[in-house]
Amino acid sequence: MKTFKYRLRPSKNQRTQLIHTLEVCRWVYNKTLATRKIAWEQEGKPLSLYDTNKLLTVWKRNHPELKGTHSQVLQNVQERVDLAFRAFFRRLQAGEKPGYPRFRGYGRYDSFTFKQSGFELGDNGLRLSKIGTVKILLHRPVAGRIKTLTIQRDVIGNWYACFVCEVEPEPLLVNDLAVGVDMGIESYATLSTGEKVPNPRFFRSNEKDLAKAQRKLSKARQGTLERMLRRRVVQHIHQRIANRRKDFAHQLSREWVDSFGKIVFEKLAEKNMLRNHYLAKSISDAAWNQLIAYTTYKAENAGRVVVTVDPRNTSRQCSCCGTMVEKSLSVRVHTCPICGLSMDRDQNAAINILGLGLQSLGIAHEAPASRHGE
């Protein structure tokens, strides 16, 4: 599956209809959630998706405005509630903090989905059932068989069409090169080849602008036009940061997938790492798991292999002889007292990560040569 995302340019009337559709979806979401919540609290059992689908027919009779939204769109809303409850019960059974599904407040529902019908992409634009033909900026063709279409609103009010398509894999030429990747803050990533990727620090580079905009927002009175405009400025800065971060991750993941047949990452528990208050902002800004996710799906389509491994001791262990060498974070060079290997500590970790990944694939890994006596 591959997603193709395009900007929409709805007219003023179409924008009103799109917002109305989101509000109808939000109502159905909250109504479905409330119904399932009551069933769970009073009877101790969950309602099925089939049960709530039947209720949708009753709701349409009592609320005629629901008929103005395509039936598949409303069914998908109930599927989202069902997924939220499945995740809730899965966490409950696993003994984790379950996190009960939440109701959506006004303006807190930002997408709706058509499943194979209710829309048509043509030369004149994107025709949406009950809404009309919306102008779409097709900067590249939609490839493959369209499975679903999601209409999405971002935080600053822009609209997008996201087509999920069934696309035939396009394998690249066979490539036996393998690389290990050590993610970091000083350098965004260090490869086992020794190459370093500088940290773009998208949030840090926009932090002053964001702080200034947030101060102005906090001074604006609640419910005023000024406050609404100030909030949009803040949202726009957040959106700009997110877009730059995504573009960077897409470009870097594409470069790696084109260059290597096997890519090994360390398995990162970002939630746990964010507990370090000194590094939390930098870790959040790096968004390493986003890069790993982008690399993984690109690799699957290209016939490449992505492996994640437990990074435990990869910074301490000598990649040449296996000796554990203790060093503080301030020490940037790995120097082994046993074999004499001396190299950048992050590259040493990346080589160890590569070794673990190849080992999991049943492939022998040649350690770097000792530099003892140099």
Stretch-by-stretch model annotation:
Residues 1-74:
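Gly/serine-rich nucleotide phosphate-binding loop at the start of the catalytic core
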Residues 3-5, 16, 130, 140-145, ...:
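Positively charged, helix-rich recognition surfaces that bind polyanionic ligands
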Residues 33, 37-40, 85-96, 167:
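Long, hydrophobic, amphipathic alpha-helical segments used as structural scaffolds
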Residues 50-154, 285:
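Acidic carboxylate diad motif detector
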